[in-house]
Regions:
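Long, non-catalytic terminal segments
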Residues: 2-126
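Short acidic/polar capping segments at secondary-structure boundaries
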Residues: 80, 132-135
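Non-catalytic alpha-helical scaffold/packing segments enriched in small hydrophobic residues
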Residues: 116, 136-137
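Residue-level detector of conserved catalytic or cofactor/ligand-binding positions
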Residues: 137-147
Length: 147
């Protein structure tokens, strides 16, 4: 043990009021306003994935359930790098795999994974899947990894 005198620090100083803690859920006037806000966040999410290295090739996708058309979801197009995705690139896809808004091709793997997820879990509004170089390297190891 050290002979240093403990500091008297008020750890409650500067705390946020309870109402400002945690996630802040926004309220929107209509579904179109909510959609635009969430699509901007979705596009930003792709850029964050790129920034943090979850951008290996074209493997990976993030989806967002449409607030008005609950059986549709927004997804990134095939072949557009995460660092370049903007709201105008995003595709609205129905559960049959048809692109109902957007002019690019949908990633078949993204549709296969996310359509099942969104169907099975109506309480889930967004999902992400990526192939990081670290995760990919683990699948190429010939012997099992140890805990």
């Amino acid at each position: 043990m050290s002979n240093v005198s403990p500091l008297k620090i008020d750890i409650t100083d500067g705390r946020l009021p309870v109402k400002e803690k945690g996630l802040v859920f926004q309220e929107f006037a209509n579904p179109a306003e909510e959609r635009r806000n969430q699509l901007e966040k979705l596009a930003a999410g792709f850029r964050l994935f790129d920034y943090f290295g979850f951008n290996e090739g074209v493997a990976g996708h993030i989806t967002y359930r449409d607030p008005e058309f609950k059986d549709h979801f927004w997804v990134n197009p095939l072949g557009v790098h995460f660092s370049q995705i903007s709201v105008s690139d995003l595709l609205l896809v129905n559960h049959d795999g048809k692109v109902v808004q957007g002019d690019k091709d949908v990633n078949v793997a993204a549709f296969a994974i996310h359509s099942r997820l969104h169907k099975a879990r109506p309480d889930v509004n967004a999902a992400a899947h990526s192939h990081s170089i670290y995760g990919l390297s683990l699948i190429h190891i010939s012997e099992p990894t140890r805990p």
